[in-house]
Amino acid sequence: MPGIKVREGDAFDEAYRRFKKQTDRNLVVTECRARRFFESKTEKRKKQKISAKKEVLKRLYMLRRYESRL
């Protein structure tokens, strides 16, 4: 769980920014949103397949883009 120690003389904005950065790095908000509603195993697998396809297409696009520059 992210947490920060507020230093003496720290402004609220500075402390809040450091806390927000930690939560973003630890994916706390993303995980909470994902767990908000129950997701069955089939739905999880379906999302994983879709994201895998997107990743492959993205890599293929980048590869073709790189090859066209040569």
From Swiss-Prot:
Family matches, as Pfam families: Ribosomal_S21
GO MF entry, a single one: structural constituent of ribosome
BP terms from Gene Ontology: translation
Keyword tags: Ribonucleoprotein, Ribosomal protein
Underlying gene: rpsU
Name of the protein this chain belongs to: Small ribosomal subunit protein bS21
Family: Belongs to the bacterial ribosomal protein bS21 family.
GO cellular component annotations of the record: ribonucleoprotein complex; ribosome
Highest classification ranks of the organism: Bacteria, Pseudomonadati, Campylobacterota, Epsilonproteobacteria, Campylobacterales
Record organism: Helicobacter pylori (strain J99 / ATCC 700824)
